[in-house]
Structure formats: structure tokens, C-alpha cells
Amino acid sequence: VRLRSAFTLIELLVVIAIIAVLIGLLLPAVQKVREAAARMQCSNNLKQLGLAAHNSHDTLGHFPSAGKNGCEAPVHPNIVANCADPNYGQWTAAYTVPTSNLPIRRQEWSWAYFVLPYIEQNNVFVTTNDTTVRRSVVKTFHCPSRRQAQLYNNNAKIDYAANAGQSLADSNTSGVIFRTGAGGPVRMTDITDGTSNTALFGEKRMKLDKFGQSYDDNESVFSPGWDSEVARAAVTDLDTNGTAGRPLSWGPNQDIRVTNPSIFTDPESGLSQFGSSHASGCQFVLCDGSVRGVRFNPDRVIFRRFCTKADGQVLNGDF
């Protein structure tokens, strides 16, 4: 019987090389499929948030508001001293003056808290312990391309923000969801530019000096409410004292992952912008419940109109 010879070294190397080439060809395709699935999940998350806002509108007669800063009255007595510190300011974690009615007690909390009953999270909504709520991770709040749904800095987070309009100034009411007390709650009839022409929620850009770190924001998704954690704008940013404006690039930007944040001349850039970890663009859910993508460098004027609910202008171009 003639024995079959084994692989020679050259034959083995050729087989290994062929396998390596096949892996090299297939890996990008697998990565594209994974990213497409992540982008679809992100789109579905936005659809759910849009539907939740609509259900909230049907129940209450208006969209949720964006809440207030932690140091806005009424202030919990435990943080009065901190709020007097100019370096503490609006970036404090919010507390609330205790009352017996949870929704009233948490009126300065973010829109994300008030949509909880409409995304099958009513058990979190009715939880009486504030700390437990602040640490309740909601998967719908997370884009799988951006970060995992888990606690960061011992707080629950969110990767989506409400459309606050042209800026995050306290007095601004040009968007759909803005600071509680700045104006009356927004109703469908207030969106005179058309619900199919106005952004409701969009993906958030990462704060650039936090690239390569475990989290990009320092507070819970639920409190304080009026904060860049849960609201973003089209045009201007706020300095840390909440008053001075900083011009932005007028549109969403891509989060290009880097490990050296020192290359950025302005680490605060991205603090109040929309943006995305997807390569194809930033996704928004509109006030009519539809989801659309916006490229990273849209026409500045058109994008500003897209974030304004009643300026009487037409979206007369592709962005």
C-alpha cells in the first residue's frame, strides 16, 4: 500500500497564506454588516423615542420639556453651598426639593425621565429612590456604535439629545424641547414649519477631550435636565459659566475615535453639538416620527432651519 505523503512546509505556508487572504477579504465585509446592524438599531432607538414623545403628547397635550439645571430654584438644601461656588455652577448633579408627588418633584429632570412610561420603563419612572433612577441603564438610550449600555461614572447615560433649537441659551425657545420655564410646553400646533421638516431628537457628538475614555459626559441622563447630556443645538455652545457663546460648525460632526485628546485646540468642542459614531452621517427622528440621516457637513442655513420649529423658512435643499 502506498502511503500518502504529508503537507510539505511550502504547501502549508501556501494554505495559510490563502486563508489569511480570505480573512482579509471577508473581515471588512463582516465589519460593514455589523455597522449596518448597529446603525439600524440606532435608527430603531430613535423611532422608539419619537413614538414615546408622541404618546406623551397624546397623554399630556404637549411634548416633554428639557428640565432645569441642578442649581436652579428650587434647590435642595444639601447643595446650596455648592451652587454658590462659581466653579460648580450648572454642572452639578441635580437634586430636588422633596414632595410627595414624584412627577412634580422631578419637574426639573430631563425629557428622558418623562418618556420612560412610554418605552416600557414605567418601573423606573415610579421608583421613589432618586439614586436608583439615576443609575437605571436603559438600552434604548444607547447607540451600539458609540458605547455599551452600562453605567459610566456610576450614572446611567444617553447617546441621544433633544433638539433645543438654535442654541442652549436659557431663554432660547426656538426648538421643540427646551428649558422648563423658558416658555410654555410645545404642542404639535406650535410646529408651524411642519413636523416633517423639524428635528425632534438626534444623535450626540462626543465631547472631544473625552475621546478614548469610558464616558464623555459627567451626569446622569435623568438629572439635571437642562444640560448638554440631553439637549443639543444647531448654532452655539455655552462656556462653563453658562453665559458666553462659542460658535460651532453649524452641523453634526463625526466622532473619529482617537487616543490623544491633546491634539484638539478646543476640548470643549462637541459639548453641545449633534454628531454620530456612524460613518454615514448623523441620524435624527423628526417630529412626525420619521427617521432621516443628515450628512456631517450640511448646508449651514438649512440645518439651522431644520432645528427651528417656527421660523417660516423652507428646507429647500438637500442636507
Where are these predicted regions, by residue range?
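N-terminal single-pass transmembrane signal-anchor helix
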Residues: 3-42, 48
